[in-house]
Swiss-Prot record:
This is Ras-related protein Rab-1B. Residues 173-201 are annotated as: Disordered. Regulated by guanine nucleotide exchange factors (GEFs) which promote the exchange of bound GDP for free GTP. Regulated by GTPase activating proteins (GAPs) including TBC1D20 which increases the GTP hydrolysis activity. Inhibited by GDP dissociation inhibitors (GDIs). One of its GO terms (cellular component) is perinuclear region of cytoplasm. The lineage of its organism: Eukaryota, Metazoa, Chordata, Craniata, Vertebrata.
Length: 201
């Protein structure tokens, strides 16, 4: 039987409340944006199928909205994730400082070889920007993970963020990988080194 897709990737969006995770998801999955998006209670997910290098990839994207206020996202949420997008708000220094804690959550609960992507959202608010692009890029580089600034409002880099993540996962899984499931023989080429104390800015 021929499945309708070659790969199924589970992606997570994590980060502080209000950084625009749901807006990024809505922009990518439905190409919509609303100023008055009400915080999701519990877990929400959307599916979008993309084409990449001649392969059909189904992306199942989970939004952690609601629980992150107390950082009570359960370990089951991370289980089986192929990629995790850590989002902060470029106009909110605290949301950027908290990125380190989110990365620690990933180290604690996600599979060892999960792909990560750092995203600074709300890049359209140039006059309110407090987190410097260079600072965030250097931090991401030090961990060996990709970094992008996005705007869910005007769609800047939203498509690119999810496509980058899908491409990175596909590259890690290699040719002939099954659709989903853990592959213990995957080589781990960019496991981040845990940083010692201090803020990330």
């Amino acid at each position: 039987m021929n499945p309708e897709y070659d790969y199924l990737f589970k992606l997570l969006l994590i980060g502080d409340s209000g950084v625009g995770k749901s807006c990024l998801l809505l922009r990518f999955a439905d190409d919509t944006y609303t100023e008055s998006y009400i915080s999701t209670i519990g877990v929400d997910f959307k599916i979008r199928t993309i084409e990449l290098d001649g392969k059909t990839i189904k992306l199942q994207i989970w939004d952690t909205a609601g629980q992150e206020r107390g950082r009570t996202i359960t370990s089951s949420y991370y289980r089986g994730a192929h990629g995790i997008i850590v989002v902060y708000d470029v106009t909110d220094q605290e949301s950027y400082a908290n990125v380190k804690q989110w990365l620690q959550e990933i180290d604690r609960y996600a599979s060892e070889n999960v792909n990560k992507l750092l995203v600074g959202n709300k890049s359209d608010l140039t006059t309110k920007k407090v987190v410097d692009n260079t600072t965030a890029k250097e931090f991401a580089d030090s961990l060996g993970i990709p970094f992008l600034e996005t705007s869910a409002k005007n769609a800047t880099n939203v498509e690119q963020a999810f496509m980058t993540m899908a491409a990175e996962i596909k590259k890690r899984m290699g040719p002939g990988a099954a659709s989903g499931g853990e592959r213990p023989n995957l080589k781990i080429d960019s496991t981040p080194v845990k940083q010692a104390g201090g803020g990330c800015c």
